[in-house]
Amino acid sequence: MYDKLNVALSKDLRKKYGIRSFPIVKGDVVKVVSGARKGEGGKVAEVDHHSGLVIVEGITIAKIDGKQKGFGISPEKLQITHLDLSRSERFQKIKELANIKHITIQEEPIQEEQQKTEETKQEIAPEEVEAKEAQDKQEVKENDQ
């Protein structure tokens, strides 16, 4: 039983945050750096703390009945290429660790993403969306005739 599974960070992330490894969670993007699956990568689908393995989307193994099953990979064979900082406590921990090395980190990426989505929602009013859908339907009918 493992409490947290630490995984090495890519060189870009090491330089950006000043740390070598960080606990992996569902949503991080990883790359396999050794073993038979070297070079493959994807988003973390599941972290099995009981067996100490990480299951990555897109990396599967065939079962005897022909179905595909997620393939568990040991954390020491992985490298994090993109951190999922959607949880504020995780971002705060990164910020604290970077602060030790006197590295300043920009404003929370979550807030930036939320601002962008709010701006796009404000730009497109519901009436405009309905009008555009009606116009598209008319064009399809005209093309069919």
Curated annotation (Swiss-Prot):
Compositional bias segments (type: Basic and acidic residues): 113-145
Family: Belongs to the universal ribosomal protein uL24 family.
Disulfide bonds: none
CDD domains linked to this entry: KOW_RPL26
Gene: rpl24
Protein name: Large ribosomal subunit protein uL24
One GO CC term, this protein: large ribosomal subunit
Region of interest (Disordered), ranges: 108-145
GO biological process: translation
Keywords associated with the record: Ribonucleoprotein, Ribosomal protein, RNA-binding, rRNA-binding
Subunit structure: Part of the 50S ribosomal subunit.
Domain of life: Archaea
Reported function: One of two assembly initiator proteins, it binds directly to the 5'-end of the 23S rRNA, where it nucleates assembly of the 50S subunit. Located at the polypeptide exit tunnel on the outside of the subunit.
Pfam families for the chain: Ribosomal_L26 (PF16906)
Keyword RNA-binding tagged: yes
GO MF, any single term: rRNA binding
Organism: Thermoplasma volcanium (strain ATCC 51530 / DSM 4299 / JCM 9571 / NBRC 15438 / GSS1)
